[in-house]
């Protein structure tokens, strides 16, 4: 099933964090924080100004992004957990 976000919303797949520390310690699932890094799966067309003019999206499908800890709404699609968020919830694009 495909899902196309509307307006300035973005569908994001979380990128899992490392399972080991730099020193080689394995981090148990219970101690891991939810990752705040992800990959853009799909984007809406953008927001609209009061005049009706389209404001194009800054991010695009495939971009690797950084977002706030509490950003977005969790969505399950075909058994995969994704996040739906507004473009303004994105802190930056990782290059």
From Swiss-Prot:
One of its GO terms (biological process) is chaperone cofactor-dependent protein refolding. Keywords: Chaperone, Cytoplasm. Its main location: cytoplasm. It is found in: Cytoplasm. Coiled coil: none annotated. Transmembrane segments: none annotated. GO terms for molecular function: ATP binding; metal ion binding; protein folding chaperone; protein-folding chaperone binding; unfolded protein binding. GO terms for cellular component: cytoplasm. Heptamer of 7 subunits arranged in a ring. Interacts with the chaperonin GroEL. PANTHER family: 10 KDA HEAT SHOCK PROTEIN (PTHR10772), CO-CHAPERONIN GROES (PTHR10772:SF58). Together with the chaperonin GroEL, plays an essential role in assisting protein folding. The GroEL-GroES system forms a nano-cage that allows encapsulation of the non-native substrate proteins and provides a physical environment optimized to promote and accelerate protein folding. GroES binds to the apical surface of the GroEL ring, thereby capping the opening of the GroEL channel. Belongs to the GroES chaperonin family. This is Co-chaperonin GroES. The lineage of its organism: Bacteria, Pseudomonadati, Pseudomonadota, Alphaproteobacteria, Rhodobacterales. The gene is groES.
